[in-house]
Amino acid sequence: MPFSNSHNTQKLRFPAEDEFPDLSSHNNHMAKVLTPELYAELRAKCTPSGFTLDDAIQTGVDNPGHPYIMTVGAVAGDEESYDVFKDLFDPIIEERHGGYQPSDEHKTDLNPDNLQGGDDLDPNYVLSSRVRTGRSIRGFCLPPHCSRGERRAIEKLAVEALSSLDGDLSGRYYALKSMTEAEQQQLIDDHFLFDKPVSPLLLASGMARDWPDARGIWHNDNKTFLVWINEEDHLRVISMQKGGNMKEVFTRFCTGLTQIETLFKSKNYEFMWNPHLGYILTCPSNLGTGLRAGVHIKLPHLGKHEKFSEVLKRLRLQKRGTGGVDTAAVGGVFDVSNADRLGFSEVELVQMVVDGVKLLIEMEQRLEQGQAIDDLMPAQK
């Protein structure tokens, strides 16, 4: 299991060029940004908790690229990482988030009343709807760098806060280490639980250390509101249900998330946030809202159409396979979600998904009738 070696201070005895990683066959955002000069400039720096440049880039060094998506190739180990290593992270953020500038300010809107429509996506096409985000608790290191004690303290805090939720959000916590293999696998197969730590991002960044210690899932009684604890982020908050009522899913998401934040504040803890980057998370790809609003949608005709990728790009949407990022579409079912995280509010992102999915369904219906879709091609959003 590869883990970063950056705590070896002996490396500073070697010149920077001798320690610079071989990125010659790499295709990720980190590799595009990191030059020998930048490495030399940043390699001796560390955050107050001891996180170094080599810690940040190890996952991108060990994983040159991905056949389907452009990976980031770097992670943060604490809130200060984005500041101490801003010369690495700022260009990555600009490239990953559509030209987002170091002077830009992020906006947050968690008022579901501002969402137009979204309660009537056709269930003949939309099989399920889901909204997720991540949150990090200020004062703790992030998962690539946190200690066992920190991780256990985060778990304890989260479980105490979540146990105060009531009504439709009332539920219970299931620690990973007290589950049987069969129970774990069932929750994974049902798309409720995060996968076992086989992802290169988790392994190479050090996020899988001590697995499954202090990891688990909290969910309400009908499994429509879930919180993952200590996977890639301190908290992953998920609202999901069958069918196409994205409005209901988003309303539950906003209500639950706001209540969780209030409960943490009552214990004198707050979430990592700043006006420029919004909510701070482990992977730079999730900064800002951290929000992914997605549907599992049946598009057997449009999914094979030569313009499908172009349509999604213009709608600022992205597609994944039925089982997630590394998988194929089974039976013409795609996971379609917003492509952006930073620079747009939560409501704006969910609105893009709602409006875009309606158009995708209209296109699919045209193709079912053997008709052309050229006149439905959207302008670039």
Swiss-Prot record:
Record's keyword annotation contains Hydrolase: no
Reaction catalyzed: creatine + ATP = N-phosphocreatine + ADP + H(+)
Entry keyword NADP: no
Phenotype upon gene inactivation: Conditional deletion in adipocytes leads to defective adaptive thermogenesis: defects are caused by abolition of the futile creatine cycle, thereby reducing whole-body energy expenditure and leading to predisposition to obesity.
Binding sites annotated in the UniProt record for creatine: 72, 232, 285
Region (Disordered): 96-123
Record field: compositional bias (Basic and acidic residues): 96-110
Key words of the record: ATP-binding, Cell membrane, Cytoplasm, Isopeptide bond, Kinase, Membrane, Mitochondrion, Nitration, Nucleotide-binding, Phosphoprotein, Transferase, Ubl conjugation
In-chain residues carrying the UniProt-annotated modification Phosphothreonine: 35, 322
Residue positions binding ATP: 128-132, 191, 236, 292, 320-325, 335
Record note on modification: Ubiquitinated by the ECS(ASB9) complex, leading to its degradation by the proteasome.
Boundaries of every Phosphagen kinase N-terminal domain copy: 11-98
InterPro entries in the record: ATP-guanido_PTrfase, ATP-guanido_PTrfase_AS, ATP-guanido_PTrfase_cat, ATP-guanido_PTrfase_N, ATP-guanido_PTrfase_N_sf, Gln_synth/guanido_kin_cat_dom
Phosphotyrosine carried by residues: 125
Cross-link entry Glycyl lysine isopeptide (Lys-Gly) (interchain with G-Cter in ubiquitin), positions: 45, 107, 381
Induction per the UniProt record: Strongly up-regulated in response to cold in fat cells; expression is dependent on cAMP.
Tissue-by-tissue expression: Expressed in hippocampus and corpus callosum (at protein level).
Span list, region Internal MTS-like signal: 130-138
MF GO annotations: ATP binding; creatine kinase activity; ubiquitin protein ligase binding
Localisation per UniProt entry: Cytoplasm, Cytosol; Mitochondrion; Cell membrane
Family note: Belongs to the ATP:guanido phosphotransferase family.
Subunit structure: Dimer of identical or non-identical chains, which can be either B (brain type) or M (muscle type). With MM being the major form in skeletal muscle and myocardium, MB existing in myocardium, and BB existing in many tissues, especially brain. Interacts with SLC12A6 (via C-terminus); the interaction may be required for SLC12A6 potassium-chloride cotransport activity.
Role summary: Reversibly catalyzes the transfer of phosphate between ATP and various phosphogens (e.g. creatine phosphate). Creatine kinase isoenzymes play a central role in energy transduction in tissues with large, fluctuating energy demands, such as skeletal muscle, heart, brain and spermatozoa. Acts as a key regulator of adaptive thermogenesis as part of the futile creatine cycle: localizes to the mitochondria of thermogenic fat cells and acts by mediating phosphorylation of creatine to initiate a futile cycle of creatine phosphorylation and dephosphorylation.
Protein name (record): Creatine kinase B-type
Species per Swiss-Prot/TrEMBL record: Mus musculus (Mouse)
